Amino acid sequence: MPQISRYSDEQVEQLLAELLNILEKHKAPTDLSLMVLGNMVTNLINTSIAPAQRQAIANSFARALQSSINEDKAH
């Protein structure tokens, strides 16, 4: 079942494109990109979420990430 979001597809796609452009501009390899994005997620959780909710949010984010991974062999 698809998730319902309060954000439009256009908003999400525009922000995603801008973030990807920054990574491409810096010629960031995949491992560096993942490290930076992971640090960004950690920073957002630690600075924007109440301490009592941080672990639950991190677990929810991790589950959403794992469920969105495509397991086909192409890359």
Swiss-Prot record:
Membrane-spanning parts: none
Ranges in coiled-coil conformation: none
Family, similarity comment: Belongs to the UPF0352 family.
HAMAP family: UPF0352 (MF_00816)
Protein name: UPF0352 protein YejL
